[in-house]
Regions:
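Short, high-confidence coil segments that cap the C-terminus of an alpha-helix
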Residues: 46, 98, 127-130, 215
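A short, conserved beta-strand element in the Rossmann-like catalytic core
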Residues: 16, 109-110
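Catalytic metal- and UDP-sugar-binding loop of GT-A-like glycosyltransferases, i.e.
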Residues: 9, 28, 104
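N-terminal nucleotide-binding beta1-loop-alpha1 segment
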Residues: 1-19
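Short aromatic/basic micro-patch
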Residues: 27, 110, 179, 230-231
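Left-handed beta-helix
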Residues: 198-293
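Conserved N-terminal catalytic core of the sugar/cofactor nucleotidyltransferase
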Residues: 1-5, 32-104, 110-114, 121
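Conserved core of the sugar-phosphate nucleotidyltransferase
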Residues: 111-197
Length: 293
């Protein structure tokens, strides 16, 4: 996957967080959400990444310089939507003209390297111009629905407000993460129109352009439905932390770590444990700590 690249959208203010810091730096298990995304992209084997910064850009750029110095940044001065954000990285894209690009929001901490790899394999084997990562959920309200044609290819992504009663019953939703052939994406970006109440340029409309021009568009349905999850306020951030906390504790207990009561136990997913370790209530372990037997 050496020839691949990725773009992380991280320009948004996240007003409901009521923070003076970029939303993507809000932490899930002691690690900024964008760092979870970067770690998964790196584990998947993607070596060249560009982060689109915007709100409080200097704070995010300083964090990236210290923690991921190889990551490139481009600033979106006017925040006019996700497709507009991607267009800010046009020079980055042109350097990867004959490659594929993975595009994702920086506030989706549960994206995992397995989903990235498998969606790329599907993207290549199906010879797609664009591949949407989708997930099937019990409550799809608020998400764009994946509408497929009789050949099971993506026919449209329909937003909640535009969905008919029959489309609203569809449980397969758009995660907001995509693979694109770079050359095709560069051609599509200027054709996206701000045909919405916000007068903004949205990346899902690139899918509409691709479909209208006869390019192959498909969706890779992940079994990890948590990849869709993000946080727009501190209540949702708390929910993400609890999901992540429970996953870590479950994996530790299945690996032999004794946690007789999980009350107040918060452990970083980078921590490691020796054999026969017992963790008592109220224990907090941060970072890549190593607890020996």
């Amino acid at each position: 996957m050496e020839t691949l690249c990725s773009i992380i959208l991280a320009a948004g203010e996240g007003t409901r967080m009521k923070s003076c810091r970029p939303k993507v730096l809000a932490e899930v298990l002691f690690k900024p959400m964008i760092q979870h995304v970067l770690d998964s992209i790196t584990k998947a084997g993607i070596k060249d990444t560009c982060v689109i910064t915007g709100y409080q850009h200097s704070i995010l750029e300083a964090y990236l310089k210290e923690n991921d110095p190889n990551v490139k940044t481009v600033r979106q001065i006017q925040r006019l939507g996700t497709a507009h954000a991607v267009s800010m990285a046009i020079d980055f894209l042109k350097k990867h003209l004959h490659a594929d690009v993975f595009i994702i929001g920086g506030d989706t901490p549960f994206i995992d390297d397995d989903t990235i790899r498998k969606s790329y394999e599907h993207h290549i084997s199906s010879q797609n111009s664009a591949t949407v990562i989708s997930a099937e959920v019990e409550n799809p309200f608020g998400y764009g629905r994946i509408v497929r044609n009789p050949n099971n290819k993506v026919n449209a992504i329909v937003e909640q407000k535009d969905a008919t009663d029959s489309i609203q019953k569809i449980k397969e939703i758009n995660s907001g993460a995509y693979w694109f052939k770079v050359e095709d994406l560069i051609k599509a970006l200027p054709k996206i129109k701000p045909e919405n109440a916000q007068n903004e340029y949205y990346l899902p409309d690139a899918i509409k352009v691709f479909i209208n021009e006869g390019n192959i568009v498909d969706a890779y349905k992940t079994t990890n439905s948590d990849v869709i999850l993000g946080a727009n306020d501190c209540l949702q951030l708390n929910a993400l932390n609890e999901i992540a906390r429970q996953k870590v504790l479950r994996n530790l207990m299945l690996s032999g770590v004794n946690i007789p009561c999980t009350d107040g136990v918060i452990i970083s997913n980078d921590a490691t444990f020796g054999q026969d370790v017992c963790i008592m209530p109220g224990t907090i372990i941060r970072g890549n700590a190593a607890i020996k037997s």
